Amino acid sequence: MINEIKSDAQTRMDKCVESTKTQMAKVRTGRAHPSLLDTIQVPYYGSLTPLKQVASVSIGDARTLTVSVFDRTMIAAVEKAIMSSDLGLNPMSAGATIRIPLPALTEERRKDLIKVVRAEAENGRIAIRNVRRDANSNVKELEKEKECTEDDVRRSEDDVQKLTDAHIKLVDDVLAAKEKELMEF
């Protein structure tokens, strides 16, 4: 039973780390990256559709994204969706493709983005600690129900703490890499 609680905690902590990585990937750096446009929804036949379902996104060069729309009638809608996103991008259409130059980040904007990234990392750490708290309380419930000994509880808490420390270190490593990426250029 304790092993099930520990493996559940491991799985949930892994998900917390992945979620933190995903949230940090959404933060724009100075480099062009196709995942930058993953959150954009385009109106298509009356419903909002993810951009990657109506177009392919590729890297033109280090500071330019190229969007190739599958249906030429969608070019204006895709362009409007990119403009209205909160990414601060200014697309230019050229025939069947849309070029999106990425403006250089100012020092002030970099510092703001670093604050955002640090907040995301802290949210990840908090989520991991909440998983630890849940796992420890589940083990204490087992002790109250006399399904395990006090030594088992202590051992389990130590194991869960080691898991927590390892996962928080992963979040810190992701944060350090993202901060380094933001301060380049």
Curated annotation (Swiss-Prot):
Subcellular location(s) per record: Cytoplasm
Keyword entries, A-Z: Cytoplasm, Protein biosynthesis
Record-linked InterPro entries: Ribosome_recyc_fac (IPR002661), Ribosome_recyc_fac_dom (IPR023584), RRF_sf (IPR036191)
GO cellular component, one term: cytosol
Chief localisation class: cytoplasm
Keyword Protein biosynthesis: yes
GO MF term set: ribosomal large subunit binding
A single BP term in Gene Ontology: cytoplasmic translational termination
Domain of life: Bacteria
Similarity remark: Belongs to the RRF family.
NCBIfam families the UniProt entry points to: frr
General function of this protein: Responsible for the release of ribosomes from messenger RNA at the termination of protein biosynthesis. May increase the efficiency of translation by recycling ribosomes from one round of translation to another.
Name of the protein described by the UniProt record: Ribosome-recycling factor
Recorded name of the encoding gene: frr
